[in-house]
Amino acid sequence: MIDISRQLTPSHPNWPGDAPFRVKPGARIAQGDSVNTGELCTSTHTGTHVDAPWHYSETGARLEEVELNRYVGRCRVVTVRAEGGLIPAAALAGLPKRLPPRLLLHTGQPAHWTEFPEDFAALDPALIREAARRGVRLIGTDSPSVDPLTSKTLDAHHACLETDTLILEGLNLAEVPDGEYDLVCLPLPLAEVDGAPARAILLPAGTLPEGEG
């Protein structure tokens, strides 16, 4: 099993302008309480997280309306590199004509962020459309977003909407060899939200029962 989730620490940098990640101490045994507790505050797009379609479309599905099994099943991890800030469709040129339903892109982000990586590699919408033509219905990246930091049109997000492709961002793929795996990605079961942090792991391909697509 390989954990591909980013560890959330007190200094974890969120998207500029988003609510910062923090855990406020609550009860403390050392202060005479019977338990230790904490109050969690964070953006819905902290660390490893999923984007529900409602994040980028007013008529898109909220997280609870997305079938959980779409985040579970066979995937392929591929190392890619950006050209002019975007991962081009040509990055898929050497891959099979038919791909697993889930494609995870290792763009070179480190395992841990000490500051927000503003120059991250985003995805060319043409890559998303080409991946969809090859059977991909979930695209993941180790970058904090599929679109550039300064994008206002969110072309990659809308290419995902157009092709019914789900989005998984902020993965930790630093130590993951390219190849096929079984993905288990479980977003927090939050209602009426545009996304949620998720715990994502990779298992050897074929670990999950047949039928977990």
UniProtKB/Swiss-Prot annotation:
Pathway: Amino-acid degradation; L-tryptophan degradation via kynurenine pathway; L-kynurenine from L-tryptophan: step 2/2. One of its GO terms (biological process) is anthranilate metabolic process. It is an enzyme of class 3 (hydrolase). PANTHER family: CYCLASE-LIKE PROTEIN 2 (PTHR31118), KYNURENINE FORMAMIDASE (PTHR31118:SF32). This is Kynurenine formamidase. Catalyzes the hydrolysis of N-formyl-L-kynurenine to L-kynurenine, the second step in the kynurenine pathway of tryptophan degradation. Its cofactor is Zn(2+). Zn(2+) 2 binds at D51, H157, E169. The gene is kynB.
